[in-house]
């Protein structure tokens, strides 16, 4: 809104404001009430019990509860303080207003949570997994219904999206957020400053998004359409394609296949897009779009890499070009992945 009033694009206005100092990065003022998180959703992690690195600090600063911190902070130690972050002698405790945890066991995190959503466990949900430790795709299959009030992870988040979409009407509509994207490895931006990194804030260079600073990207959020978007595949797959690690390829044929497999949205904001009504639909989307489970996509991915290297790499997947692994396939037998340049 401020950018529109100034007659500037969101990116140009953000750059101008950062250079003037009227706008700052949230990381520069971590104790500012507008900058720290208020809500925390925890999924498949005992964050406050074992998997959080330095979880005692989370107990103090995020929850404001009893903790076991024994060391003193830098201010009391007389240590070197950060130069680009505003220092507060007394940091805020208990920054979070809400903690929601999805788990099938009563972990330490559940004990600290405001709301615990009981999720389905093994043999109660359809899902899949793999690992960089082996080359196979494994299924999780629902043999029985989830116990008592528990639901699968997919159904829980789908329900949250549906309720949020209904409640936000009249409060939130289409909003534009300005987000920053760090300079990514395996991308052209990785060579943005090939002769040495300079700091725009110290006046060593100009602030150029994607070169001397993060990418600055305006993103439109259609909040009332959250549920429709959650349960469908968006249009960008057909507009810009799929990819990773600096390469991309066309996905039109895969999107057409998913329209036949999952059917399409008949109306609403996602009209005509492939549906994701169930966990199996979501699994089929992954299996169809991933080069590791779709031979035709693997060939396209290797061809995309060939454009950069000048050598033909498609022979690495040509013998699997006609192989398309479906969810029912891995239910019958775990399947070996196809060679891919992005894995």
Identify the role of each PLM range.
Residues 1-101, 106-343:
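Domain-level signature for respiratory redox metalloenzymes
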């Amino acid at each position: 809104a401020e950018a529109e009033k100034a007659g500037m694009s969101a990116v140009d206005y953000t750059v101008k404001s950062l250079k003037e100092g009227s706008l700052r990065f949230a990381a520069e003022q971590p104790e500012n009430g507008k900058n720290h998180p208020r809500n925390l959703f925890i999924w498949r992690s005992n964050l406050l019990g074992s998997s959080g690195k330095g979880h005692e600090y989370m107990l103090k600063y995020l929850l404001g509860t009893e903790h076991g911190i024994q060391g003193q902070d830098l201010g009391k130690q007389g240590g070197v303080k950060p130069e680009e972050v505003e220092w507060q002698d007394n940091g805020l405790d208990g920054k979070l207003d809400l903690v929601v945890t999805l788990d099938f066991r009563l972990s330490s995190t559940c004990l600290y949570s405001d709301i615990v959503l009981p999720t389905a466990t093994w043999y109660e949900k359809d899902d899949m997994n793999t690992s960089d430790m082996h080359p196979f795709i494994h299924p999780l299959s629902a043999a029985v219904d989830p116990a008592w009030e528990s639901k699968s992870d997919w159904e829980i988040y789908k329900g949250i999206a549906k309720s949020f979409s209904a409640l936000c009407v009249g409060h939130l509509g289409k909003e534009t957020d300005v987000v920053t994207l760090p300079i990514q490895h395996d991308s052209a931006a990785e060579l943005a400053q090939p002769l040495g990194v300079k700091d725009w804030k110290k006046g060593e260079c100009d602030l150029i998004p994607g070169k001397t600073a993060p990418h600055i990207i305006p993103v439109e959020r259609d909040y009332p359409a959250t549920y429709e978007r959650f349960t469908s595949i968006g249009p960008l797959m057909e507009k810009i394609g799929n990819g990773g690690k600096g390469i991309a390829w066309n996905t039109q044929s895969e999107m057409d296949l998913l329209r036949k497999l999952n059917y399409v949205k008949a109306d609403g904001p996602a009209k005509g897009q492939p549906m994701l009504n169930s966990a199996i639909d979501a699994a089929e989307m992954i299996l169809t779009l991933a080069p590791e489970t779709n031979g035709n996509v693997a060939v396209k991915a290797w061809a995309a890499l060939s454009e950069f290297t000048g050598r033909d790499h498609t022979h690495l997947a040509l013998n699997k070009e006609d192989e398309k692994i479906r969810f029912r396939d891995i239910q019958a037998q775990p399947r070996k992945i196809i060679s891919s340049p992005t894995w």
